[in-house]
Amino acid sequence: MAAANRGSKPRVRSIRFAAGHDAEGSQSHVHFDEKLHDSVVMVTQESDNSFLVKVGFLKILHRYEITFTLPAVRRLSKDIREAPVHSLHLKLLSVTPIPEGYSIKCEYSAHKEGVLKEEMLLACEGDIGTCVHVTVQARVMDRHHGTPMLLDGVKCVGAELEYDSEHSDWHGFD
C-alpha cells in the first residue's frame, strides 16, 4: 500500500536563478565563463612522432577550417608537406613555421555523426623516412541538435546540401 501512495504524489522541483538573471531568457541558452581554458583546439603529443588534435563539436555536413600549432619536432625540416596517403575528409591547406613550432591549417569535412578521427601524415621534402602522424578528433552532431560553439581555431567555411531535403532538384517518379 505504501508503494501505491508513493506513485500518486506528484513530485515538484523548482529551479532557482541567481539574482540579476532573467528567468525567461535563461531557459534556452547556456552561458559559459569567458575565462574557460578549454575553448581552444587541444594538441597532445602521444608519442615521439604522433599528435592528437581535439577540435570539439562540429555539425554534420559542414566544412571547417581548422588552425592549430604543432610543437617543434626535431625530425622535421622547414619544408614539410602532406604525404601522398591522405584522407578524403581532411585536407592540408598550409604549414607555416613559427617560433613555437608549426602553424597547421587544414580543412575538415564532417561527413557522419559520432566521434570521428581522421589522420594526416606530414613528411619532410628531403627525407622520405621522416614523418609525423597527426590525428584530428571531432565530435560531430546531427543537424537537429543545434549549432555547436566552435573552439578558437575552428571556423565554419561552408555547408553541404542534403540529398533528401527540399533543396534537391529531383522531383521523384512521375
Curated annotation (Swiss-Prot):
The lineage of its organism: Eukaryota, Metazoa, Chordata, Craniata, Vertebrata. GO terms for molecular function: protein phosphatase 1 binding. InterPro entries: ADISSP. It is found in: Secreted. GO terms for cellular component: extracellular space. The modification N-acetylalanine is found at residue 2. The modification Phosphothreonine is found at residue 147. Adipocyte-secreted protein (adipokine) that acts as a key regulator for white adipose tissue (WAT) thermogenesis and glucose homeostasis at least in part through activation of protein kinase A (PKA). Keywords: Acetylation, Phosphoprotein, Secreted. This is Adipose-secreted signaling protein. Belongs to the ADISSP family. It comes from the Eukaryota. GO terms for biological process: adaptive thermogenesis; glucose homeostasis; positive regulation of non-canonical NF-kappaB signal transduction; positive regulation of protein kinase A signaling; positive regulation of transforming growth factor beta receptor signaling pathway. Pfam families: DUF4517. The gene is Adissp.
